[in-house]
Amino acid sequence: MSNKKKIYTVATAHLDTVWSWDFETTVSKYIYNTLVDNFKLFKKYPTYTFSFEGSYRYELMEEYYPELFDKMKEYIKEGRWNVCGSSFENGDVNIPSPEALFRNILFGNSYFDKKFGKRSVDIYLPDCFGFGWALPSIASHANLLGFTTQKLAWGSAYGVPFDIGRWRGVDGNEIYASVNPHDYYFTLKKLRDWDFVQNKLKENEKYDLDMTYIFHGIGDRGGAPKEKSVKFVEEEISKNNSSDIEVLASSADRIYHDIDENFTPEQKAKLPVWNNELVMKDHAVGGYTSRAVGKRWNRRCQELADIAERASVTASYLGIKEYNKSAIDIAWKRFIAHQFHDDIPGTSCQRVYKRSWNDYAVSMNQFANELEASASALALNMKTDFCKGTPIMVYNPIESQRQQTVTARLSGIGNKNVRVFDDDGNEIKSQVINRTNTYTEILFIADVKSLGTRIYDARVSDIPCNAESAVSISKNRMENQKYIVTLNPNGDIESIIDKEQNNFQILKEPVSLGLLKYNGSRVWPAWEMNYNENKKCGRQNPR
């Protein structure tokens, strides 16, 4: 690297897969425009380089525009069209689970590697409604180097912490971060003499940092930067030999490679550090609740995906069922596509959600099919010869031992009672909760080790279960072996007594549901809620 100060200019065309338009419009118009508009610039400007994120969009290019896709691959080989962002979809990073974020990265970079022989090393989220504290930890564990956004300038809850620095995650792992690159929807008319750039370079001198990062491009419908912006950057590059500031037409993640490979440990240690979340005041608050059914189904997809994966791996390890990687991956990708930052937050037009909700249901069914097939294979290989009645296998898919109620449907019971016994012959608490002409539904308490299975024995009986229970419920009082909970006439929780701690009273005052003040938003009425109002204590229920 030279000793000159450097301006990394990154050309981009931000594309909202959905927003105030639907998926079909993106495929038929915006994906196509992104390809052909950039091809024109490549032909005319030899120094022009372009960065575009999201392997999902590349899959759409490959499927719907195969000839243009092949042409794009040649530009990727030349290093002029750059894949970036590492992910399958340019998604929200607060609502998805950590596993979903890891899968997003896995699918994204795996596709880039398979199709282009490339991998990006950045989380590239120009437009997203806040960034949780776990994100740098996840990115670091995914072997990524950097994070880029311009969104903090919109209204970060903590301001913009620095231009370029280190973002430390909850577990102490760090990535580099560029969080003040200016708006991606921007046409460059000046660089070396631009006050914004000069101020950033001067500020960065405090950290012995001789570089900065600047966006130029277009959004939110894809396409390409304005030609006059591309022409201006090329003219600025031509002045590099006579200037003390070097202008680079850069890929989105080049700056992170350069810092990581060329800085000494002492230089890296001098970079400013942000050790907190980076949440937004704008959009983020309402985006956590708007169109809540989609968030519920997304969570259910994540839960079913984890459960199906573990059951499938167990069955495969035991050699009793083949691991169906293709079906599981397809189901994951289908709903991760809807973790896009204008989809799952609930900020898109209504017709978008007809597709996303349908896709959630399809993925849930696929995961459920894999879970049922794997669990059935496991059940057929369990030892059940100790059972005197109907064997019931209970599977615990989480990482800790679990004691919880289980429901099961049994046929051929008629009007008889059912009693349930564990594999040691001990009767456990159970009851019949429903009867139909075809089945009897029972409920019992199962205790299963982490990621384990256990067989219970359901026996037809003339008498019901007589195992004692510590649970008692009255109109305003609930008690079990650990707690006594009392409600007041208003429905508030008046008292919680911990029986195991000498009847310690946990509450200092009754707990009631808080009511948040919401005056609406004229600009973004479907999702915007006031950040400062939501930080306040909610008003109590009227007495």
Language-model regions: role of each:
Residues M1-P391, P397, Q404, I413-N417, ...:
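Catalytic-domain carbohydrate-binding cleft regions of carbohydrate-active enzymes
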Residues R454-I463:
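Short, hydrophobic/aromatic-enriched beta-strand segments in well-ordered soluble domains
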Residues D462-S474:
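Short, Gly/Pro- and small/polar-rich lid/capping loops
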Residues I473-R477, R543:
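Short, hydrophobic/aromatic-rich segments at coil-to-beta transitions
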